[in-house]
Amino acid sequence: MKITISGTGYVGLSNGILIAQNHEVVALDIVQAKVDMLNKKQSPIVDKEIEEYLATKDLNFRATTDKYDAYKNADYVIIATPTDYDPKTNYFNTSSVEAVIRDVTEINPNAVMVIKSTIPVGFTKSIKERLGIDNLIFSPEFLREGKALYDNLHPSRIVIGERSERAERFAALLQEGAIKQNIPTLFTDSTEAEAIKLFANTYLAMRVAYFNELDSYAESLGLNTRQIIEGVCLDPRIGNHYNNPSFGYGGYCLPKDTKQLLANYQSVPNNLISAIVDANRTRKDFIADAILSRKPQVVGIYRLIMKSGSDNFRASSIQGIMKRIKAKGVEVIIYEPVMKEDSFFNSRLERDLATFKQQADVIISNRMAEELKDVADKVYTRDLFGSD
């Protein structure tokens, strides 16, 4: 089969490479530089498995900027374009997804389109009715940035928002490329699948917020956070995972998904969902106040990225801390080797790590790094377990 991937971010590339082990895959992107890299078997994003598979595996994979070449004769088109959250409308910006749907409908109306981008609850049903089309399925992704292909090779589950033969064929494409066997697979309706994605990510955000509030409590009262978390997590119903305190949840998915779900609750009584969003804001206030209490002249931000093994710092929690500190008039310098710019939000980027360490009175790091251990007395982090 010919499978086209529209969008070459984490979601698109990981799905494309997974399927290209067994089928023809054409990746479509509007950025020529990314297409050129992919055709040279180089990854435009930081992801260990994507880089490895592109360089060493026998993949039936190519990239193009030509939508006619990409969509023509495709059996499936996977839509993995960005859907950023718009705070003005309280809604995902689905314009890129809609543009792909219109293009595919014009060029190859027989292709089955599968939306992998995160979308509002009810979007698939609504656009099918609005455009008078039926060949559209939603299938949520559950991957981590920096480990996107790994998570597709070893998926926790596969969810397809349709119960049909074509949905089963698409699930088989994902199962065929995976290393994991006997993957739990759920076939449901499109609107339920959309809700599954948002509620799953909101639960993860809630868990992050819970352990962060536990940590704020312990730090305020001089208690040992690690001992409390270890004791709480001995209960198998809670489990000893996803429990490492941080500066708040961040990244591309959790902040926008929680806010979108909250917007979907406008006509439904709720307390918990809104509390999760508020708790994340409160945590950043708490962290910023703790840093400012040290009365630093210069605060060093060690890495803007959200987690190790990633090159993405969209909506990373440390940016919220940085903005709060700058608002109090404290000078901020940044060490972020993946950035080519000289400044970020009017704060200087220091390229030399030794100079960065020397100039900062306090260094804040969401996760502790080996290269900071020689200045551990300067470092402020809430990382207890060395995990994301």
From Swiss-Prot:
Domain of life: Bacteria
Keywords: NAD, Oxidoreductase, Phosphoprotein
EC number per UniProt: 1.1.1.22
Processing and modification events after translation: Phosphorylated on a tyrosine residue. It results in a significant increase of the dehydrogenase activity.
Chain sites annotated for binding NAD(+): 2-19, 29, 34, 83, 118, 145, 252, 256, 314
Residues reported to bind substrate: E141, F142, L143, R144, E145, K197, N201, Y242, N243, N244, P245, S246, G250, K307
A Pfam cross-reference name: UDPG_MGDP_dh_N
NCBIfam families recorded: NDP-sugDHase, PRK15057.1
Name under which the protein is recorded: UDP-glucose 6-dehydrogenase
Organism, as annotated: Escherichia coli
Gene that specifies this protein: ugd
